[in-house]
């Protein structure tokens, strides 16, 4: 039997609000918060969004999956 593609894939989550203010204009920040995690491709086919702590914004923000 042949194995299919891996079900679990590694994804990178990036802060949605780092470097942006309410008008969508970029601002000076020291960096962008990123997390590396895994997701199950069968259970979560869409992009992953998790609320994580951003050390640059110094608060909990929504982190979204970035394309590789």
From Swiss-Prot:
The keyword NAD does not apply. Keywords: Chloroplast, Plastid, Ribonucleoprotein, Ribosomal protein. The keyword Plastid applies. One of its GO terms (biological process) is translation. GO terms for cellular component: chloroplast; ribonucleoprotein complex; ribosome. Pfam families: Ribosomal_L33. Its main location: plastid. It is found in: Plastid, Chloroplast. GO terms for molecular function: structural constituent of ribosome. Belongs to the bacterial ribosomal protein bL33 family. NCBIfam families: PRK00504.1, PRK00595.1, rpmG_bact. This is Large ribosomal subunit protein bL33c. The gene is rpl33.
């Amino acid at each position: 039997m042949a194995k299919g593609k891996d079900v679990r894939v590694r994804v990178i989550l990036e802060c949605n609000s780092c470097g942006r203010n309410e008008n969508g204009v970029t601002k000076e920040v020291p960096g962008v918060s990123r997390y590396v995690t895994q997701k199950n491709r069968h259970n979560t086919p869409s992009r992953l969004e998790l609320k994580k702590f951003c050390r640059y914004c110094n608060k909990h923000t929504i982190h979204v999956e970035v394309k590789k």
